[in-house]
């Protein structure tokens, strides 16, 4: 979760807030429609957005990618099943030759909708099968694997393996999987000192000077990953979705669908100078259906919910819960949640 300082106290117009908060995130460019976006980590370990301006694949490129797939995988299927034991056997049979592409892409599954359990009978071992919609896949210009027909992200074996290992038998089942992007306590204290020096209503210096001072005072923020290896693709997806959602909220990345964003909703002078806003995702499935014999499970809905929390910062950089909720933040989080399916359809990282 990225804490976004709210700097409206000395904002003469809405655009100044976006410029001021930009110093905290350091994106390389605003993502626009028809562009592919991702994240990259530079040699100093700083997370930045990565924009590919001409991300579209030509019809010929898509056709060639699909024709290179095994016959049965060239067509979309409303329900495709993948047996985990056969998956494991296919991987073992390859030895050190690497995982076949159709195995690495889980036969083109775009989501897991069902889990079927087949108990052992006689000499036949038991089996666990995952199932869901599937389609042929291509790799877009940003390096993301997506369905050739819908653009939905393709499930990856490495992500499923990471998830299974995180909740392996014998491990605590209540462990948290997530990420957090936070300023340091020292950085917050230094920024509070800096804001007091520039004034509240009539700041000393122009916007560029204030932004530079804030950037230097706050310093780098820290990315923390919980529950999964920090170097995994699973972790990268968590961090990218979290990071880019905040860029949308503060106006540094254009939302892929029409929706209100926090930077346009927040009113000058309506918040305290030491206020902080936190936004974070949580699962929000409608329900999990289980058959009467407990051998079949269906995940109903494709829910992700965006939540918000209001905080204030003490002079020493300590963060405390705020006593008053921010209506602009609530409107933004509710809109993001309501339009999540549309957003994910246009920006694959949210589908992942």
Whereabouts are the PLM-identified features?
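N-terminal secretory signal peptides that target proteins for export/translocation
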Residues: 1-12
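Bacterial N-terminal signal peptides
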Residues: 11-26
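Outer membrane pore-forming secretion/assembly proteins and partners of Gram-negative envelopes
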Residues: 30-352
